[in-house]
Amino acid sequence: MILLVSPIDVEEAKEAIAGGADIIDVKNPKEGSLGANFPWMIKAIREVTPKDLLVSATVGDVPYKPGTISLAAVGAAISGADYIKVGLYGVKNYYQAVELMKNVVRAVKDIDENKIVVAAGYADAYRVGAVEPLIVPKIARDAGCDVAMLDTAIKDGKTLFDFQSKEILAEFVDEAHSYGLKCALAGSIKKEHIPILKEIGTDIVGVRGAACKGGDRNNGRIDRELVKELKELCK
């Protein structure tokens, strides 16, 4: 299982890299769970990240606006992101989600067919009226994405496991794999959750708070020693 760590700036990215993160995921918590950062920040982080490490970027907790989000995804891709993550926040059903993600996939793959597109749902979707989380693997498959992901929409201390059981998450992972997709899981993940995620076959575990001093995703800063501890648990 590989470790994705989400810095907000270059200094945090350097700490994540020093700690052994496998994917450097550029985000902006001020704009939400999958809040988008600026193109110049993606570019700057790509420049300090070793070539053998992949950079990911979120394009936001997005509304149902396929044109707008396709354009945002292209911005992330040309700024240097290898993974482009889209949070299915404002889409209400399977059909809207597939339409949105199909257009993102087309836009991104036109830039570079090796770019990786991630459809991200929310384990607590009912709290924000987002698309049902357990159909995300099917959405990802039918839209031509590469990765199906779950996160949490509201960052209030509740974790992925407060909304989905280990058994349900295992089914999510297995379904994604059956479609030939990778599976990423995140959502206020704590150290003690990592062995469980590894056991159920998760490909990528995403963290921010667990890698920050004080466990605070908003006010804490990523610390290389915390990243090292998380990385060891992923091996």
From Swiss-Prot:
Gene Ontology BP annotations: methanofuran biosynthetic process
Keywords: Lyase, Schiff base
pH dependence statement: Optimum pH is 7.0.
Consequence the record notes for mutating K85R: Lack of activity
Pathway: Cofactor biosynthesis; methanofuran biosynthesis
UniProt superkingdom: Archaea
Active site residues per record: K27, K85
Effect of K27R: Lack of activity
Mutation effect (K155R): Almost no change in activity
Keyword Amino-acid biosynthesis: no
CDD domains in the record: Aldolase_Class_I (cd00945)
A Pfam family of this chain: 4HFCP_synth
MF terms in GO: carbon-carbon lyase activity
Role according to the record: Catalyzes the formation of 4-(hydroxymethyl)-2-furancarboxaldehyde phosphate (4-HFC-P) from two molecules of glyceraldehyde-3-P (GA-3-P).
Protein name: (5-formylfuran-3-yl)methyl phosphate synthase
Organism name: Methanocaldococcus jannaschii (strain ATCC 43067 / DSM 2661 / JAL-1 / JCM 10045 / NBRC 100440)
